[in-house]
From Swiss-Prot:
Interacts with XAF1, the interaction increases XAF1 stability and proapoptotic effects, and may regulate IFN signaling. The modification N6-acetyllysine is found at K102, K112. E3 ubiquitin-protein ligase that promotes the ubiquitination of various substrates. In turn, participates in the regulation of many biological processes including cell cycle, apoptosis, osteoclastogenesis as well as innate or adaptive immunity. Acts as a negative regulator of NF-kappa-B-dependent transcription by promoting the ubiquitination and stabilization of the NF-kappa-B inhibitor TNFAIP3. May promote the ubiquitination of TRAF6 as well. Also acts as a negative regulator of T-cell activation. Its EC number is 2.3.2.27. PANTHER family: E3 UBIQUITIN-PROTEIN LIGASE RNF114, ZINC FINGER, RING/FYVE/PHD-TYPE. Keywords: Acetylation, Cytoplasm, Developmental protein, Differentiation, Metal-binding, Nucleus, Spermatogenesis, Transferase, Ubl conjugation, Ubl conjugation pathway, Zinc, Zinc-finger. This is E3 ubiquitin-protein ligase RNF114. It comes from Homo sapiens (Human).
C-alpha cells in the first residue's frame, strides 16, 4: 500500500486502486496507525489521536509529522468523530457490519474472527516453511533513518530517541513490517512516536518462534486480540 498523504481536512488522499483497497484510510491516525481515538485537528489541518498529539508535542520545537510545519495544540475534530461513529465496516470473521467505533470491542470476542486470524497465521507459517530463506528477521532490526542495524526492539527505540529525535521523515516501521500482520509499505508519519507507543514490549516476550506451530498460533492470536 502506498504511503498515505493527508489533506488540510485530515483525510488521507489515496489515488486510484489504493483508495479502493483502503477505503477506511482517512480514519487512520498517521502516528499509531489505528482508527482515530478522540481525534484532534491541529492548526496546519492534519489530525491525530489526542494521546498521539500529546506525545508529538513533547519536544521543545514540535513539528507536524505529516507536513513538518510547527505543531501546536488543536481542536476536537467533531465532524470526523461523528463519521467514525456512523461509518460501518465488516468483521473479517463473521462478516457482520459494525461502526468503526465498535469494531475493536467486537473482534476481541468474535470466535470467527479468531479463526480468521489463526488461518492467516497458519498460511504464513506454511509459506515460510516452503520458502525458509524468505522468513523475515524478527529478532534484530535496521534503523529506517540511517545505515545502523542489528538493533533489538528496545535498542531501536533508544537509538531513535538519541540520534533521530528531530527527524520527521515518514518511514516504514521495520518491526511492524517483519510481522505476519504487518504492512511492509505503510509509512508512519512520526516513526519515533510510533515505536514508543506501539513497541514498548518485545514480541519475543509473548511469542516464542521456536515452539511448535499450534502453540505459536495461539500466542500470536492472543497478542492480536489484546492489541485490538
Amino acid at each position: 500500500m502506498a504511503a498515505q498523504q493527508r489533506d488540510c481536512g485530515g483525510a488521507a488522499q489515496l489515488a486510484g486502486p489504493a483508495a479502493e483497497a483502503d477505503p477506511l484510510g482517512r480514519f487512520t491516525c498517521p502516528v499509531c496507525l489505528e482508527v482515530y481515538e478522540k481525534p484532534v485537528q491541529v492548526p496546519c489541518g492534519h489530525v491525530f489521536c489526542s494521546a498521539c498529539l500529546q506525545e508529538c508535542l513533547k519536544p521543545k520545537k514540535p513539528v507536524c509529522g505529516v507536513c513538518r510545519s510547527a505543531l501546536a495544540p488543536g481542536v476536537r475534530a467533531v465532524e470526523l468523530e461523528r463519521q467514525i461513529e456512523s461509518t460501518e465496516t465488516s468483521c473479517h470473521g463473521c462478516r457482520k457490519n459494525f461502526f468503526l467505533s465498535k469494531i475493536r470491542s467486537h473482534v476481541a470476542t468474535c470466535s470467527k474472527y479468531q479463526n480468521y486470524i489463526m488461518e492467516g497465521v497458519k498460511a504464513t507459517i506454511k509459506d515460510a516453511s516452503l520458502q525458509p530463506r524468505n522468513v523475515p528477521n524478527r529478532y534484530t532490526f535496521p534503523c529506517p533513518y540511517c545505515p545502523e542495524k542489528n538493533f533489538d526492539q528496545e535498542g531501536l527505540v533508544e537509538h531513535c530517541k538519541l540520534f533521530h529525535s528531530t527527524d520527521t521523515k515518514s518511514v516504514v516501521c521495520p518491526i511492524c513490517a517483519s510481522m505476519p500482520w504487518g504492512d511492509p509499505n505503510y509509512r508512519s508519519a512520526n516513526f519515533r512516536e510510533h515505536i514508543q507507543r506501539r513497541h514498548r514490549f518485545s514480541y519475543d516476550t509473548f511469542v516464542d518462534y521456536d515452539v511448535d506451530e499450534e502453540d505459536m498460533m495461539n500466542q500470536v492470536l492472543q497478542r492480536s486480540i489484546i492489541d485490538q
